[in-house]
Amino acid sequence: MAKSSVKYVIVQDYETGGLPGKEKRPFLDIALCEVACVVVDMEKLEIIDEYQALFKPGYKEDLIYAPEALAVNGLTMEMMEEQGKDAKSVYKDLKDLYTKYKNPRQGAIVCGHNFTGFDHPFTIELFNYYGDDAWKYVKWVEDTQKLAYYSNLEQPDYKLSTCCSLNDISLVGAHRAIHDTRSNAQLFISYIKRLRGEGNSTSSKEENRFREHFKFQIPS
């Protein structure tokens, strides 16, 4: 019996200075403000490590810090200036985290909510800016929003807050990276448990009924 080589998944989230677009590039134009990572042990399905950091403003010229974006995440320029780290230090921290929690075959696996479309491009540009390639460390990218679409054909919407609420997961201090990431890690764990059939007695009963119905119809 083969054993899964997936040992860790790093659930990650960014707070940013706005939304990227055709003429507003992630990280290079739209500022990174905050990052948080929560590491999930995939055997125990438990959180085993955390990392969070604010980015010191002005890591390059002409960065966008839209007032409406800062109003949503609650960050201020003063807070980031006083508590923030240089972007290069954060890049090194993330590289170390990806290296520490790499999987034997898959490298680092990162996950977030709408991570593929929004967050991961910031990681790519952050690493590129310092002459590195995020794909050297990250091989798989997972997305709890995608898992929500796959799991539920219909729900009010597929925002993180709604997905957490539907899965009885509290989301306190939403729109700050560490709070979003902790809740999203629990959401990710709940989806994995569902995939593994943990706590899903209905599917087990259906499977047994299916086997009982067809077991005498299989030719010997």
Predicted regions and their residues:
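Conserved non-catalytic scaffold segment of RNase H-like nuclease domains
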Residues: 2-124, 165, 175
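Acidic two-metal-ion nuclease catalytic site recognized across multiple nuclease folds
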Residues: 2-4, 166, 182-220
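Residue-level recognition of the N-termini of beta-strands and the immediately preceding loop/turn
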Residues: 106-109, 137-142
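Substrate-recognition/cap helix-loop segment adjacent to the acidic, metal-dependent catalytic center
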Residues: 118-140
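Short alpha-helix plus adjacent loop in nuclease-associated cores
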Residues: 141-155
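A structural motif
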Residues: 152-164
